[in-house]
Structure formats: structure tokens, C-alpha cells
């Protein structure tokens, strides 16, 4: 009788163990079944690819691009500053009109260049160089016909220089957007040169 009881208990224990093992296996299987499958063929995108941007744009600029961008930024600032002087200080209607045109057109070009720089991740200069500052200070100190002669002389010489620099960038630049800026701005500069020569001829 005692042996029979022990046998029954042993059978119950074994049956219980098998049931627990079966439950554990089923739970493990369910967990695997409900997990999302991993597709190893899907590409893994980095942050640059997701955003569609890269931090290498500015470093990819050629020395020609950088030199042009810097010169155009400083030259554009000077044209606006001198144009403001002409519009406010000159008593010659032609010279005043020339100054207004410089402020408007170069202000627009400066904004376009700043937008390009922001997109390219390039830092433009925010002040005139020493030579440009001296030219501005000298012009600011002049009055009347002397001012008009100095201003129109500067506009003729500066725009000849600007046109040469913009043509060089359009031909030799590497960055497409900056080359396009140079090409599309050239007709405006050529018009400025023509108007500057007319204004210079009107000054007595």
C-alpha cells in the first residue's frame, strides 16, 4: 500500500513538471511569434541622409569660390554704404539717383548672397576691409561737387573691378549656385557701370 502511494505521487510530480515545461515553451514561442521580424535587407540611414543635408558643403568650396564670395560680400556692403551717402548728401540729381540704385540693387544682391551662404554653411565677412573702410571714410568727409566727383570715380573703377571678378567666378567657379549668382548678377553690374559713367560725365 505504501509503495502504491509513493508511485502515484511520483507520477503526479513528473506530470506537473512536463506541464510547466510545455507552458514555458508555449510562452517563449508566443513571444517570438509576436516580435516584429528584422529585414536585414533594409538600408540603415544616418542623420545626414535623413535630413538631406551635409556638413561638408562649405569645406568643398574651392579657393576661387571662397575668394569670390568674400570679395562680393564686402564689395556689396561698400556699394550700399556709399550709395546711402550719395542719396543723402549729393545735390546732383543724377548722382543721387545713382546712389539710390546702388542701395536697391546691391542690397538685393547682398541678400541673395547671404541666402546662398546660409545654405552652403559658409560664413561671409560682415565688415569692410581696411582699404574699403578708408575709401568710405574719405568719401564721407567730402561735400558738394568734390563728393560727386569722388563718388562717381569710385563707382566707375569699382564696377570695372566687380565685373572682372564676377566673370571669373562664372567661368572658373566650382560651386554651381555661386556660379549662377555671379552670372545672373553680371548684367546688373554692367548696367551700373554704364550709369556710373553717365553720372561722372554730368559732374562739373
Task: List each model region and its residues.
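His/Met- and acidic-residue-enriched segments that coordinate or traffic transition-metal cofactors
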Residues: 2-6, 11-204
Amino acid at each position: 500500500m505504501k509503495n502504491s502511494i509513493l508511485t502515484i505521487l511520483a507520477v503526479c510530480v513528473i506530470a506537473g513538471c512536463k506541464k510547466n515545461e510545455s507552458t514555458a515553451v508555449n510562452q517563449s514561442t508566443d513571444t517570438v511569434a509576436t516580435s516584429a521580424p528584422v529585414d536585414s535587407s533594409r538600408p540603415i540611414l544616418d542623420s545626414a541622409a535623413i535630413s538631406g543635408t551635409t556638413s561638408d558643403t562649405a569645406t568643398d568650396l574651392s579657393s576661387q569660390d571662397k575668394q569670390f564670395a568674400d570679395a562680393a560680400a564686402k564689395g556689396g556692403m561698400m556699394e550700399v554704404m556709399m550709395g546711402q551717402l550719395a542719396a543723402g548728401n549729393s545735390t546732383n540729381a543724377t548722382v543721387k539717383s545713382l546712389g539710390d540704385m546702388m542701395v536697391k540693387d546691391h542690397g538685393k544682391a547682398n541678400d541673395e548672397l547671404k541666402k546662398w551662404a546660409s545654405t552652403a554653411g559658409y560664413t561671409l565677412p560682415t565688415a569692410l576691409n581696411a582699404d574699403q573702410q578708408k575709401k568710405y571714410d574719405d568719401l564721407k568727409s567730402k561735400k558738394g561737387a568734390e563728393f560727386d566727383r569722388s563718388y562717381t570715380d569710385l563707382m566707375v573703377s569699382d564696377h570695372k573691378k566687380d565685373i572682372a571678378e564676377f566673370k571669373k567666378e562664372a567661368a572658373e567657379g566650382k560651386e554651381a549656385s555661386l556660379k549662377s549668382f555671379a552670372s545672373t548678377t553680371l548684367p546688373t553690374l554692367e548696367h551700373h557701370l554704364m550709369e556710373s559713367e553717365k553720372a561722372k560725365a554730368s559732374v562739373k
